[in-house]
């Protein structure tokens, strides 16, 4: 029996900054979508971004996690993969060239996400005149629409400041955000 699967699911619009012809940045909509590792087109898009973003190990880690979900080694209910894309329609045919960033996380309990990996397309990080800006913040804003609590372990250095700027607070080695400003409860990461 052949299993029928559908492609990425649109979750919400997200606001990014897009470079205008006059070299200023204007607010623009992007789409935040949940990828489906069981869908071959979604997997191809994830495979391609890990190739295009070859020096960014998080893109490879996200793709490898999707492979494990696809092979039923990990639960698709627990392990989630989302992308931010400039694509606005036809999410059953994800255009990997329009992916602005990707995030993979674990739903540890209802409305609680632990972010394992968040990667913005490197061409929008390392270049001062990039076509798109605010991609990482748009990903976090979108996750905040769908989860009441979010936790992660940041890299040392500037990523900690990035998460603080986006409303996260430091709790030991972790960063935590809560919609209701709750204190984090210890959650088993297994």
Predicted regions and their residues:
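Non-catalytic substrate-recognition and accessory regions of acyl/acetyltransferase enzymes
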Residues: 2-130, 138-190
